[in-house]
A protein has these predicted regions:
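Short histidine-centered loop motifs in beta-beta connectors
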Residues: 8, 14-18, 22, 51-54
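Short, well-structured beta-strand-loop connectors
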Residues: 18-29, 56-66
């Protein structure tokens, strides 16, 4: 299982997947907002979303776990 981490401190603007979703390498999982910029967090590999640890509107710190993906 792979932990997908936040690359920045900001807030969760939009979640594009659900638990159980199949994702491909490079698919956008969530969109974060920081200083009025949108940052797309992408899947590091093909797999299944096992857990989402954030919800829309959450404030997050750099390196917080966003999701867990099983290969």
């Amino acid at each position: 299982m792979t932990e997908v981490l936040s690359p920045i401190t900001g807030s969760v603007w939009k979640i594009l997947v659900e638990v159980g979703s199949q994702v491909n390498d490079g698919d956008t999982i969530v969109i974060l907002e920081s200083m009025k910029m949108e940052i797309r967090v992408k899947s590091p590999h093909n797999g299944k979303v096992m857990e989402l640890r954030v919800k829309e509107g959450d404030s997050i710190l750099e390196d917080d776990i966003i999701a867990i993906i099983e290969q």
